[in-house]
UniProtKB/Swiss-Prot annotation:
GO biological process, one term: Toll signaling pathway
Organism, as annotated: Xenopus laevis (African clawed frog)
One of the Pfam families matching this protein, by short name: Death
Record protein name field: Myeloid differentiation primary response protein MyD88-B
Known function: Adapter protein involved in the Toll-like receptor and IL-1 receptor signaling pathway in the innate immune response. Activates expression of target genes in the Spemann organizer region during early embryonic development. Is required for normal axis formation.
TIR domain residues: 147-281
Gene coding for it: myd88-b
Keyword annotations from UniProtKB, A to Z: Cytoplasm, Immunity, Inflammatory response, Innate immunity
Any one Gene Ontology cellular component term annotated for this protein: plasma membrane
PROSITE patterns according to UniProt: DEATH_DOMAIN, TIR
Residue numbers spanned by region Intermediate domain: 106-143
InterPro entries in UniProt: DEATH-like_dom_sf, Death_dom, MyD88_Death, Myelin_different_resp_MyD88, TIR_dom, Toll_tir_struct_dom_sf
Amino acid sequence: MACGSSMNSFDMNSIPLVALNYTVRHRLCLYLNPNAVVAADWTRLAEEMGYDYLEIRNFDRYPDSTMKLLEDWQKKCFRATVGGLLEMLKKMERNDILTDLAPLIEADCKKYLEKKHGPLPLQDDNVDSSEQYRITKSDDPYGSMPETFDAFICCCAQDILFVQEMISRLEQTDYKLKLCVFDRDVLPGTCLWSITSELIENRCRKMVVIISDDYLDSSECDFQTKFALSLGPGAREKRLIPVKYKPMKRPFPSILRFITLCDNTNPYTKVWFWDKLAKALAR
């Protein structure tokens, strides 16, 4: 990768950011935390990562803004790799960081690859079963890079035909979105509630709630919706996207009335339905 360093023996874009240990992160913070006049600091890095002004201001309230930024980017961005970080530092013209940290980064990447290609570690008896390495079909078996999704699909079994249409419209087209469909993607043998919570809170950027009369009778859908709403008033409006795809006989759920509905039953707006939904999931 063209990062101006000597780390040519690795494909840095294939190594997740989690490979970088505390020493590298701490030294990176020492470089980027101070407000420098001539050198780009952590706020410029946040801009390169795609954060907006209000999000960057929020990071500013933490004692170690750079460390918090790295943790958040690693958690939210599906493409948070060592290579991506190095490319941004190069774009910021922070060659001093690249030169100083290159040996440490290379060492961490070697350790990560050695661990990845070694034997699977045994699960600690003190670790709860909900924290096992694999909970979805495509999870990294070593736990280094959990599988992430654009959206968790909250639905009941009676609406599965519409979910299948969503898959064909959103995953198998130019939108190339990645949906988390519980019955398709989650491995059996895990605790239903804890795995669902993990997926909604940490693995999926959004949650599509498919509203129907059958949805109102589903205890699983009720739990998923209320859990997503409990994650915080600042995030829940952006996280939840209610979808109505067929007429209902029963009242619309009151807890979702304050969130804009994506309605596929309105004949006047039906033509824009899939494009609007795809853009809402991608933003």
